[in-house]
Amino acid sequence: MAESRAERKARRALIEAAEGSEEKKSSKKSKSSQDAKGKSAKGKAKAKRPGSRRNDDKASQTRSKRPYKNPVPSARKAVDPKSPCSIMKACGGCTALNRPYKKQLAAKQAAMEELFATLCEREGISVDPIRGMGVTLGDPGKYPAPRGFRHKAATPFAPGKEGAVRCGFFERGTHKIVAVPECPVEAPGARQILNGIAREAERLHIPAFNEDKHLGLLRHAVVRCGWRTDQIMVTLVTAQRDLPHARDFFEAVAALDPHIVTVAQNINGRPGNAILGEETRIVYGAECMRDQLLGCEFDISPTAFYQTNPQQTELLYQLAIDGMGLQQGDVLMDAYCGSGTIGLCAAKDAQDRGVGIMLLGVERNPAGIADARRNAELNGLTRSAWFMADDATDYILDAADNNERVDVLSIDPPRAGSTPEFLEAACALKPRRITYISCNPVTQERDLHQLLDGGYRLLKITPVDMFPHTDHTETIAVLERR
């Protein structure tokens, strides 16, 4: 699918901001580089490096068939002997790892200002300074490079020579696995557990899955580490339920770290690259691990959605809660609620302030609703929180038809954004405030226009750096009924 005009504008702003300083440096070095090229031409000719392919990981904001220049310098070219990551040349995850953190934030800020320029001009506001990890753009002093912030780590497995089990990251643009001794942005210890799983599989002769031949057993592993707790959960993805030496294998995995409380097996026998299958069972320990956000406790099941960067998640959720302005007796609808984290944090915050509200969460995934109901009970909110397994658009259309009361609406849709029907019904319900969290500002910008046309004004929009060292930015918008 070709990029839209808004997407191209966002990309162009990132490129210009990220490369502005590099142009000054390159102009000073042009003469010396030309001399060097002349000398090297007399020596042994070297083959040119093929053009690098675009990064296609989760942090990419759009997909396009057009040639795409990464908004940060190519990881393959940016590496130096002092790089904090030993595999930065091959890994496509942290393409800006070698850039100063302040410059990363400045590039993202420029992109968001470009993307939301029309909306901001229409509303007479400016995009707030981006909230980085431990720092806001514009703050004086140093901007330390974030490390160890990803509390979810994963690996694919592939067969090696003589029964070896290979694990690590896919090399950028390929399905070739690059070994990862450690990852500077993952929670400490997570990568050691993943590498240990491969060694235990080798020891017990459990073959890795070959995705081309569709043979073998061990496909993936996911490690999730608590932030406010020290609990760890491991999910093993296998091609079938039965494994040789299964009990020994599960116990060996559980013994890799004393903080592992859950080992789960997910069975995925389908062809293709999807990581998880439909069946999951607990093979060691508790059904869930536990973590905390903004004073709320959350049980996290093996396949539940839970933010990868909990430190920035707390910041993002607090911005949303502040924007809600909840009052006594309000009805808060949490659309696309997942396991209920945003709504429950807001309800707990209101309760702690002595403000009674009613929370209604809507999520189409039944597993997410089951987690949300369990988490409501865990936080003593069962009497004031209800969660419905339904499509958000279908539910809000019915609510609008029945003229139901909604005082505050919280939206956190998938990357595709919301639907026109949902937004039209949201405007018909006339909530006093709307908070819109987005993992894709391009689709959020599109949706905000419809909300403004439907009778709302944009109070503020704040970028949040959820994934440092990438070009990914999340945003929170706060709207009020005119």
Where are these regions (language model features)?
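Extended interfacial segments that mediate partner engagement and assembly in macromolecular machines
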Residues: 78-82, 89-208, 228, 243
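Rossmann-like S-adenosyl-L-methionine
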Residues: 3-29, 35-38, 42-43, 48-54, ...
